[in-house]
Amino acid sequence: MEKGIIFRISRPYKVYRTAMAPKIVVPGVKGDLTVLVDRAPTLVQLRDGLVQVLDKADKVTERYFIKGGIADIARNRCAISTEKVVAYENTDVEKDTAKRDAAIYDEDKAYYQMIIDYLTTFGNKEK
């Protein structure tokens, strides 16, 4: 059986996604961190950003925008706990602009602005 990392992204009271992947890139507060097989155990504080799931050829296969949180990395698993998560495929500049404008809290506005900035910079060609 081929080795991989079991990753789980969860929000409060709900598991959003569980799967296996060769590599995962998480947005740490001190910079992006690539989680590899047999990596030393660590706990990483996450910033608002993009979680990327990579295949063996380092091609991005899945993307998720998260709103902060922590990543618990140990024994070939990466458990990401976050307040909000949105799959990249489910993003849209117009809809996320409306969500940003309707947001009450500044941190929610900043989260949606981060998504909008990413989409306007890189476009939808990556979907």
Which role fits each region the language model picked out?
Residues 1-6, 105:
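N-terminal export/targeting signal detector
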